[in-house]
Amino acid sequence: MSVTMREMLEAGVHFGHQTRFWNPKMAPFIFGHRNKIHIINLEKSLPMFQEAQKFAKQLAANRGTILMVGTKRQARELVAEQAQRAGVPYVDQRWLGGMLTNFKTVKTSIKRLKDMKAQQEAGLESMSKKEQLMFSRELEKLEKDIGGIQDMAALPDAIFVIDVGYHKIAVSEAKKLGIPLIGVVDSNHSPEGIDYVIPGNDDSAKAVALYARGIADAILDGRANAVTEVAKAVAAEGSDEFVEVDENAA
């Protein structure tokens, strides 16, 4: 689960955006600049990332759900892959407005998606060619839009976002509902309102892979710890069972 400073350096986490695009609120996390590019201070980024991992691990240990969000071209595949590995919901194509604030409607779409998949498995022979084509198109669209959250029965307990500026609607919805946010914040965005800020490059595929893998590892660690604790508790209960002593046996 642990990420090192060297790994962050190799992934280019320290490369911010051009100095002219900077957000002054990121000043505490900026080390300096080189060739008109801001350099993010990894001595700040590393402990803050570890803090975010700690939170994700604790949440997972308490059976909480973290929604992973990364819809930028270079993040899509990486986020989907790590979310699937960790067994958590994800959004990798586009954020639909109201995905959280209007979750009731989203749940209707999830039900429609599941019904259509069941219908497809049963066979579409009774449909005409045209109906089958329209059915396939609708299914494909639903799968693309909400496929990653089809097993999310309720609102998530936290959201992990790569690039808070690009996903400002997701961030705004989470804030409105009081859902804790873990966010990768580059030098051109504001860290305000993000509960667990990870100052770092939000464009490099290597950096994105490092964040997504790190959070997925933390979730899996938290779950594994929870299972171990339950096993220990069950074993302890078993050893404490009341044994009746036959006084006449002496």
UniProtKB/Swiss-Prot annotation:
PROSITE patterns on file: RIBOSOMAL_S2_1
Name of the protein in question: Small ribosomal subunit protein uS2
GO terms, biological process: translation
Cellular component terms per the entry's GO annotation: cytosolic small ribosomal subunit
Organism: Acidovorax ebreus (strain TPSY)
Gene3D superfamilies, sorted: Glucose-6-phosphate isomerase like protein, domain 1, Helix hairpin bin
Keywords on record: Ribonucleoprotein, Ribosomal protein
Molecular-function GO terms, alphabetical: structural constituent of ribosome
Family label: Belongs to the universal ribosomal protein uS2 family.
HAMAP family: Ribosomal_uS2_B
